[in-house]
């Protein structure tokens, strides 16, 4: 709590001669707006889960896993966050930049990319050399994966289907593909529990910005699209959970403004609103202070709408 917040809270409580309530609310604030206390749990699938300690000390598990387990016999391709390819726990490295570039591009689409599209995206302006770079990248990627998996020379990990190159789904399990599939399910499944499950899977898979660390121009719109989907997932999850399990909604939103988009006023305003519904006014104040700090990072300030939400809650 900042000094001005502390003075305001103390003055309000003393005016009502409620010293005990002051202590209780301060404890609640520290539990609610501080960094989430994470405890590791094991899921049935062998994944590492995340349990968040609620204000009362009880563990409210939101089962947001830090990683996914690849299907048996498949390489695990993680591109939500820093890109990483592994097979049975061993990291797979590419010998050449063009193979790494091709893998990054193909990992963004299970349907693959046309030959012309690959060359225009990765090696535009190279003329005939672009075609040679593509074939070299395909050979390198196939070779690296054969060595990692121990399969025969006839196995192709990059296949050509109707003039489109794609990662063979039989051999790759890509977190972005799962993320997109879960996104589709959020709009097709019936029932609150099924929607929460799909939204939860999206948030668990989203470790960070798509292909984090790559500054290629072609990545940027795809990165923004994935981030928007994750923000929407957090918002929908919180709205579905706020009535029956508001603490869970708060936990998810706090993780979302850390992991997904620290500058999303939609998430911050929803977080403050639910904190306000729970009567946690110091938490609302702290959330607004954090919002101001995050916006300052990009030389901005909270919008008039965000300030209105805050002022309405504080009264």
Q: In which residue ranges do the predicted regions lie?
A:
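DNA-recognition element of transcription regulators
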Residues: 82, 95-104, 128-149
